[in-house]
């Protein structure tokens, strides 16, 4: 799915694309991901120009156009220091627990990028 939510806390909705739900006729598994999750793309303060600048064949994003990409299992919007932040679920290898337990990181977004402010922390068992 595609979500619009202000994760950069500047009053402008940002665009989040979960590539795990995309399909390709010639390769059904290309977007399927794995135990570590799948690719999510974050467009900070998107405009028509920077959305059009996105190159789907690239990996890692495009900082100049405020496009950031990461491999995660899922995300939710949480409050961190009274502002919107991302709580992202990642594979357990990030915090020395099993993949099934997994970990989370807290990230804050701005036009400069997405920065980890907490984690990785093992999920409660």
Show which residues each predicted segment covers.
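Short, flexible beta-strand-to-coil junctions
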Residues: 19-23, 44-48, 89-96
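Short secondary-structure boundary/capping segments within folded domains
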Residues: 4-10, 32-33
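Acidic, small-residue rich beta-repeat scaffolds with periodic aromatic anchors
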Residues: 64-125
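Beta-propeller blade repeat segments, especially FG-GAP/WD-type strand-to-loop junctions
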Residues: 25-57, 105-112
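Terminal domain-start segments
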Residues: 1-7, 124-125
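Surface loop/turn signatures of beta-propeller and other carbohydrate-active proteins
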Residues: 60
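Generic structural signal for well-ordered beta-strand positions
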Residues: 14, 52-54, 115-117
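Acidic/hydrophobic-patterned starts of short beta strands in beta-sheet-rich repeat architectures
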Residues: 7-20, 81-91
């Amino acid at each position: 799915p595609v979500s619009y939510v202000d994760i950069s806390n500047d009053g402008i909705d940002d665009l989040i694309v979960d590539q795990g739900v995309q399909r390709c006729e010639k390769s059904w598994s290309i977007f399927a991901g794995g135990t570590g999750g799948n690719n999510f793309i974050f467009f900070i303060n998107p405009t028509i120009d920077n959305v059009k600048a996105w190159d789907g064949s690239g990996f890692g994003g495009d900082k100049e156009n405020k496009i950031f990409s990461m491999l995660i299992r899922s995300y939710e919007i949480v409050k961190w220091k009274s502002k919107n932040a991302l709580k992202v679920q990642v594979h357990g290898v990030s915090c020395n627990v099993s993949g099934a337990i997994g970990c989370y990181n807290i990230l804050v977004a701005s036009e400069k990028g997405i920065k980890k402010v907490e984690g990785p922390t093992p999920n409660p068992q």
